[in-house]
Amino acid sequence: MKRTILSIALALCVGCAFAQSNAFAKLADIKGVEHVVINKTMLNLAAKSGGDFDFGDDLALEGMSGDMLKKLENISIYNCEEEDGVETMSKQVASILNGRGWEPLVVGTDEDGEKIKISQFKKGKKSTIAIFHEEEGESALIVLEGKMDFKKMIEKQVEISVND
């Protein structure tokens, strides 16, 4: 099983806008896309346990305190390793993140062609943060929703890892 690690240096305060999650729901219908949702109840249980958090084979959060997890409403993870699905997913994610209200925070490509795009959508105190990673033959999207403080995440050097 290949492990894709998305290390995030976070520079802004973020919470999440529930309405935006509906825009991503269609990604789960793409052939080859695996979709996992970690809801508020599970996040609260993880927050009570303390330390780093590993949600099975799907997601690991390192450096995130229980107080930070309590501010999350849910985490959605979309993974795809099928070539046609990766292309379709990439186009749909680009369409969403280039849409009205989304602010790009980080956009980058490395020498191997791996791409990362981190964007946020704010609505009042809540916002949605989308972390999209793409490389040859696979893509992963993490959508965080809640009232998180990105500044604190930077200070704690939070690392988000997606296992696929």
Show where each model-derived region lies.
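Extended, compositionally biased non-globular segments
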Residues: V86-M89, S139, S161-D164
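Mid-length scaffold segments of soluble, non-membrane domains
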Residues: K70, I75-D112
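Bacterial Sec-dependent N-terminal signal peptides
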Residues: M1-K26
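Early exported N-terminus immediately downstream of N-terminal targeting peptides
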Residues: A23-D84, T88
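A recognition module on extended beta-rich or small alphabeta surfaces enriched in W/G with H and D/E
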Residues: F150-D164
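A short, solvent-exposed beta-edge/loop patch
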Residues: S119-D149
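Localized chelating/binding microdomains
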Residues: V14, N22, D57, E73, ...
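Acidic, glycine-rich flexible loop segments
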Residues: P104-K126
